[in-house]
Amino acid sequence: MGGAQSEFDATEAKLEVADFAYTNQNGEEVSLSDFEGDYWLADMIFTSCPTVCPIMTPNMRELQDMAIAENLDLSFVSFSIDPENDTVEHLKGYTENIGVNDAYWDFLTGYDLEEIQAFALDSFKAPVEKTEDDFLHSTRFFLIDGEGKVIRIYDGLASDLSDIKADIQRTVK
């Protein structure tokens, strides 16, 4: 990438995704090594979320659709922060309802709450907290390079994705 530095640049934060091996909505194991050499966009959600996830997931879906239309080599990963309720079967139904393209987007589960809390904090400096009847979690999208380093951080609640799309198009070739 040449020219001016992106407003979304996260390289100075020196965030690196911790190794993982979790299960996607199709019951398949997905691990960090599956993304070696590839760009991927990650977020944290839970399917019963009443507040921010109903904004984040359609935004991620819009970015997925753009990446497919532009033929970008970009995968998408949503880590569930409610693994007790977001089982493989539940995630499969959820992804079918929202029109996820399984070839590009994995919704992950297969761990306990403590593990995803540690993973989110270690990898993204993003705390996950369970409250009495909800979860508090990051609303950011993290663009990860083929070496597992977070290189961009985007606002997952953005009402206009045009700047994010343009940045992804410049970064992911």
Residue ranges and their predicted role:
Residues 1-19, 23, 171-173:
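N-terminal targeting signals for export/organelle localization
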Residues 17-18, 39-40, 138-140:
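Short loop/turn microsegments at loop-to-beta-strand junctions
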Residues 32-54, 60:
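Short active-site neighborhood of thiol/selenol oxidoreductases, capturing the structured segment around
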Residues 39, 64-67, 71, 98, ...:
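Sec/Tat-exported extracytoplasmic proteins
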Residues 42, 46-49, 80-81, 105, ...:
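Second-shell loop/turn segments in exported
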Residues 57-119:
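Structural microenvironment flanking redox-active thiols in thiol-disulfide oxidoreductases
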Residues 126-173:
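Thiol-/selenol-based redox modules, centered on thioredoxin-like
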